[in-house]
Amino acid sequence: MTRLNRRDLLKAAGAAGALNLAWPLSAGLTPAQAREAAEALGADYDPAPFTLGVASGDPQSGSVLLWTRLAPEPLAAEQRLPEVVEVDWVVATDPALRRVVARGTAPASATLGHSVHVPVSGLSPGTRYWYAFTALGRTSRTGRTRTAPAGHVASVRFAAANCQAFHDGFYAAHRAIAREDVDFVVHLGDYIYEHGQVGGVPADHVRDHEGGETLTLADYRRRHALYKGDRSLREAHAAHPWFLTWDDHEVVNDYSGTGGGAPFVKRRAAAYQAWYENMPHRDAGATALPDPEIHRTRRWGDLLELTVLDLRSHRSAQNLPDGTILGARQKSWLKRNVDRAPDTWHVWANSIMLSQLRGRPGGSHMFTDQWDGFLAERKEVLSHVHGSGLEDLVVITGDWHSAFVDDIRPDFDDTSSPVVGTEFTAHSVTSGAYSADWNRTNGPLMGAANPHLKYFEGNRYGYDVYEVTPRRFSAHMRVIADRRDPVSPVTTLTTFHVDRGRTGSYEDPATRNSPAQWRREQ
């Protein structure tokens, strides 16, 4: 067999779609060379046309959203498919799909990238289901999902992941999430990254992006397809239902709302459409595009209320006296929800850090792209939480590529300001963090500058698992040994608890001696 160099393999894979046995001849490659091309990208797809796998999302007590996308040539600019393909779906109460409870057919249209979003209703609360799709004479892998319970719930366990730069590591964290005994997964944003190739896959990168920076709908579709080329990500989607929000890299770094003129608005619309096409996201039919509605509130029986926030679509520029990170409509919605919130645990899925973060005593805010760039609105919202009497608030956050635990106060500069909740910021799945030297030097400085900061650890990668009962909310920081290893083992670094009816968190005594660059003495 004639061996191709890496550049030729990447070019062929990008032009035709890696690891799909329908494309090697059109790209001038044999099947063996096609597999080599896929390996050069670090991609490994399911059999066509269901190369990108299956997923479920937004579980409710009688309904769940099922997703797939037909992509026989996942990295091609266009799919060689009919304009509309009929896709059959089935839902059953057993993995063999024999005890069928629902079935139907949905159109996969080229207009939406041949994606399928099926809201299945009439299901039983708190029940596990299995599902699959069939199209073009082929059947997808079988996915597993579950509905939310109704009424009394004794416990819930869920995972949270964020920031998964493809070139920075393999998705061992998602491999572990797929194997976790959790009810659902929350993704907190930066699902993809928009920049082009890092070039040559240097020592600190295990694989590379395909092509240049994403600008068009075709670009964003290919980037999503590349990320789903990691088998572990597809396994995590197939294993559990997901709730999702986004941050900035799904479009472009640090963007705000529609700021940037007509070219940016067009780019954002393309990015949002590709995101919707590739996610198990439930939206209200014709209103889904060009602006999918991300923010929502969902109940897990009488135990937990999950509020998913959108901190990108409606924000103004940062550092304005009247600036907004939520937008007027979403802020009013959030306040109304706070006012009528049930007596339960309240979890906000929040893509960027809510708590104040100064780099050193007397220093400025480290990053004003997060809530620190919207001081008046943050104080307004958290003061409303306090005034409403809302208790048992936990905010789960991504973006920082490091783990933080913070007390939440309406006024972070006033140590007498009441604690109204706890924020857990999770490690990234793969996205690069600061160096160990930086963390060692700056961890104590951040601790001294932020009296509300209880914990900081920035040398590891992974995800969080949250375990909730009527009496306690526990956050387990799950970390991988090596992001360069696709099957890296996972361990629990430390655990923090929040007791019901009490403000603030505390570290579990059994893990209090675990490595960290800052922890406040308790």
Question: Where do the language-model regions lie?
Answer:
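Metal-dependent phosphoester/phosphodiester hydrolase catalytic core
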Residues: 2-522
